[in-house]
């Protein structure tokens, strides 16, 4: 556990020193959401109707911005070999790095979402479910994105390949995240959709780090 937390702390400290990736994600999320009122027009009912999808799709795209470089710096300077030699399974090292990535990107996106929902005219009844759905969905996006980042590590045009690999895998989280919020807005139970989001996360936690670790070992060799 000490080694796991040390990896999390290391990644957080490095990100705090550099700062650009996390800030870029939040700025992109903010600007992308706020562009929709200009594109759709001043019709409040239209904005409110599409607000859930807008918030989820832009969060999904924002999460892609920083995930590409999750392993790049370690791969380029050779420290990825050192991480593989830690007294910790490589899958847990991956999980620690994904946790740090989520704390820097997914958590801020989740906390920012209700404020942007106000700008889109979403009914306040949907705010709690929106936050809960993103809190369950964004870690899944980070875990899947980490697998894509490992598979495209060192590849030419890795960013485009990463998007092609992971965007289809993001669809289940997107569907049930949007469905949960929409259900709460019309007075239906959001619990079944949230339960599926939770199940997706529980499945991704053991599977994605294991597969990502295998891809990283292949990249190291």
What are these regions (language model features)?
Residues 64-84, 98:
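Transmembrane helix boundary and interhelical loop/hinge segments in multi-pass membrane proteins
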Residues 51-67, 71:
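Long, hydrophobic alpha-helical segments
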Residues 205-221:
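Junction motif at the cytosolic side of a transmembrane helix
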Residues 1-25:
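Aromatic- and glycine-rich beta-strand/loop motifs that create alpha-glucan
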Residues 39-50, 114-135, 181-195, 219:
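Membrane-interfacial helix-loop-helix connectors in multipass membrane proteins
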Residues 19-41, 57-59, 165, 169-176, ...:
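Hydrophobic alpha-helical transmembrane segments of multi-pass membrane transport/permease proteins
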Residues 128, 133-167, 217-221:
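A structural motif at transmembrane helix-loop-helix junctions in multipass membrane proteins
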Residues 95-120, 140, 144, 177-178:
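Hydrophobic alpha-helical transmembrane segments that constitute the membrane-spanning cores
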């Amino acid at each position: 556990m000490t080694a796991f937390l040390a990896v999390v702390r290391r990644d957080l400290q490095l990100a705090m020193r550099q700062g650009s990736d996390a800030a870029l994600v939040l700025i992109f999320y903010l600007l992308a959401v706020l562009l929709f009122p200009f594109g759709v027009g001043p019709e409040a009912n239209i904005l409110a109707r599409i607000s859930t999808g807008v918030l989820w799709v832009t969060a999904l795209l924002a999460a892609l911005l920083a995930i590409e470089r999750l392993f790049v710096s370690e791969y380029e300077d050779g420290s990825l070999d050192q991480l593989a030699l830690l007294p910790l399974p490589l899958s847990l090292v991956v999980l620690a790095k994904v946790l740090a990535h989520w704390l820097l990107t997914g958590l801020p996106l989740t906390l920012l979402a209700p404020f942007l929902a106000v700008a889109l005219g979403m009914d306040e009844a949907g705010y709690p479910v929106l936050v809960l759905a993103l809190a369950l969905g964004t870690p899944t996006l980070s875990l899947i994105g980490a697998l894509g980042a490992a598979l495209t590590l060192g590849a030419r045009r890795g960013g485009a390949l990463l998007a092609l690999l992971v965007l289809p895998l993001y669809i289940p989280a997107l569907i049930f995240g949007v469905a949960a919020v929409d259900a709460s807005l019309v007075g239906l139970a959001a619990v079944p959709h949230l339960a599926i989001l939770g199940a997706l996360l529980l499945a991704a936690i053991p599977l994605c780090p294991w597969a990502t670790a295998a891809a990283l070992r292949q990249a190291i060799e």
